[in-house]
């Protein structure tokens, strides 16, 4: 049982469970301000400023009290690990929702939404409705704070103020939710705050509200959540921190998060969904963090849980739910080597390690077709991995939706380039460029040919906003190399001339775009540039 909870307790944003949402916002704000952020949440700091000073600001504070660090030297490392974990968790759920809506789902349900601002910051497809469920005062704080700053949701957002321990399915239906249509669900940072019986009831209700094609992602509890020794060690450490803070800063109380949790025996989340016919993939949190470049570490004993990832069951019982399938060193090496030699759709089967063999979802049991690694309709342009600089991949898709190559992140690219025309020079025009739904800077690609002995410029496709990157991929130089550097400090990209034909880009460590400037029916042959030899490769 929880020592600080009751069956019908409620809270303001600065107290009890509500204050934990501010702690998560603090971690997201710290990650957003980092040198190579995995996520971008500009609203996190807005919530912190509105809530005022409190212990929840520790993650985003420039420095902690020296007395605290002297007494607990491991706090900075633990703080850094927490920020990395929250960033990885947020990135996973972001990708999970975008991939589900990219597959055609237009109903999203965020359970215990807290200060999650996905309704405002994600590029939702047109016609998507996002239902946010949480305590009334928490949702009211979020809405009023963002409204004061002029923020507008990027979807049809529907707030459902309700306690998840009560009859929330009826409130969800009354808000307009259609249980006969596929939907995508998330339960992020929720499980330890629910009694075991309430957790089972929550899953039963999700089961009754979902149909074929639906997906669910859950952050599940780790194996040491109920371990008596781990609990005692955590309690002793919190006692020391509380006593120290009472001396150096009496006005800033340190909350006992463990007193808000329900330490009760409960069924493993992965086994529950597997027993009810769902296809489940399990990955521990350390593999999730390693996959996002946030370091490999042991699973945390409490909230570092495991989450959900997709794939049909291949036999055997699932060990739990997980966020994202990790990637071995050998698999990552094969992918990187493939990326250095020509680019394109690098796929060597289910074990090749390419991004197209990972999706963030749990498939509904009624969806018999499910998801297969070699499914022909698996839309490779819908998947990808973050690159070594922490940005999301940028995909190039031709007019028929076919895969045209994957660009490792240019600076902090956060969106996808899709469905651009790849036809004759005459089809291109120099009309006005419009930012896409992400609101970032427009990237214009200009191709230059040598026609009848003279230069002739033709504007290429205008790629809608790539995150907040202001990178300009400039002209192809006729007789020299021109380096271009991202406004956010990305690697210089060189436009290399090969005889009279277009060539690829070389960033020194990665072949970024072997086919970026290719005309499918151009009078000039399309060229690619080999990173090692620089020799041309005609098509």
From Swiss-Prot:
One Pfam family it belongs to: LCM
Keyword Transcription regulation: no
Domain of life per record: Bacteria
One of the protein's GO biological processes: methylation
Free-text function comment from the UniProt entry: Exhibits S-adenosyl-L-methionine-dependent methyltransferase activity.
This protein's record includes keyword Lipid biosynthesis: no
Recorded family membership: Belongs to the UPF0677 family.
UniProt xrefs under InterPro entries: Ppm1/Ppm2/Tcmp, SAM-dependent_MTases_sf, SAM_mthyl_Trfase_ML2640-like
Single GO MF descriptor: methyltransferase activity
Region of interest (Disordered), residue spans: 290-392
Biased composition (Gly residues): 341-351
Its EC number(s): 2.1.1.-
Annotated positions binding S-adenosyl-L-methionine: 134, 163-164
EC class (word): transferase
Polar residues composition-biased segments: 301-313
Assigned keywords, A-Z: Methyltransferase, S-adenosyl-L-methionine, Transferase
Protein name according to UniProt: Putative S-adenosyl-L-methionine-dependent methyltransferase MAP_4079
Residues forming coiled coils: none
């Amino acid at each position: 049982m929880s020592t600080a909870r009751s069956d019908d307790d409620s809270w303001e944003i600065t107290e009890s469970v509500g204050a934990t949402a501010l702690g998560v916002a603090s971690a997201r704000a710290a990650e957003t301000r980092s040198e190579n952020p995995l996520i971008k949440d500009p609203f996190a700091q807005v919530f912190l400023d509105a809530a005022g000073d409190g212990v929840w600001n520790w993650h985003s504070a420039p420095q902690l009290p020296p007395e605290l660090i002297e007494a607990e030297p491991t706090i900075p490392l633990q703080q850094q690990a927490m920020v990395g974990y929250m960033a990885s968790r947020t990135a996973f759920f972001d990708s999970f929702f975008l991939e589900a809506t990219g597959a055609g789902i237009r109903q999203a349900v965020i359970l215990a939404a807290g200060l999650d601002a996905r309704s405002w910051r994600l590029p939702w497809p047109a016609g998507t409705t996002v239902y946010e469920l949480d305590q009334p005062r928490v949702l009211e704080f979020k809405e009023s704070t963002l409204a004061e700053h002029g923020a507008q949701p990027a979807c049809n957002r529907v707030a459902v103020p309700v306690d998840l321990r009560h009859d929330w399915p009826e409130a969800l239906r009354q808000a307009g939710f259609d249980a006969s249509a596929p939907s995508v669900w998330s339960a992020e940072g929720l499980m330890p705050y629910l009694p075991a019986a309430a957790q089972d009831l929550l899953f039963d209700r999700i089961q009754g509200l979902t149909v074929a094609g639906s997906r669910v992602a859950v952050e599940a509890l780790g194996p040491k959540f109920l371990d008596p020794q781990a609990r005692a060690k955590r309690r002793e450490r919190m006692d020391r921190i509380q006593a120290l803070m009472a001396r150096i800063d009496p006005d800033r109380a340190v909350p006992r998060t463990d007193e808000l949790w329900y330490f009760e025996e409960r069924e493993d989340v992965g086994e529950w969904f597997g027993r009810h016919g769902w296809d489940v993939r399990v990955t521990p949190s350390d593999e999730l963090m390693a996959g996002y470049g946030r370091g490999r570490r042991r699973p945390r004993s409490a909230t570092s849980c495991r989450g959900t990832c997709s794939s049909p069951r291949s036999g055997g019982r699932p060990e739990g739910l997980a966020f994202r399938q990790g990637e071995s060193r050998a698999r990552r090496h094969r992918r990187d080597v493939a990326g250095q030699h020509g680019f394109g759709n690098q796929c060597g089967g289910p074990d090749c390690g390419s991004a197209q063999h990972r999706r963030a979802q749990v498939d509904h049991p009624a969806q018999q077709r499910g998801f297969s690694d070699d499914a022909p309709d698996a839309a490779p342009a819908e998947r990808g991995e973050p690159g070594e600089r922490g940005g999301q991949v940028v995909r190039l898709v031709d007019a028929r939706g076919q895969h045209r190559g994957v660009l490792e992140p240019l600076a902090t690219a956060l969106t996808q380039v899709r469905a651009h025309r790849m036809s004759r020079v005459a089809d291109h025009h120099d009309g006005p460029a419009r930012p896409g739904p992400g609101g970032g800077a427009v990237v214009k690609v200009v191709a230059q040919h040598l026609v009848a002995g003279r230069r002739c410029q033709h504007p290429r496709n205008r790629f809608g906003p790539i995150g907040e990157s202001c990178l300009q991929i400039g002209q192809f130089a006729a007789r020299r190399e021109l380096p271009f550097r991202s406004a956010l400090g990305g690697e210089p990209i060189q436009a290399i001339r090969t005889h009279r034909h277009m060539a690829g880009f070389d960033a020194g460590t990665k072949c970024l775009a072997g086919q970026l400037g290719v005309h499918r029916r151009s009078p000039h042959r399309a060229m690619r540039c080999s990173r090692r030899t620089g020799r041309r490769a005609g098509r």
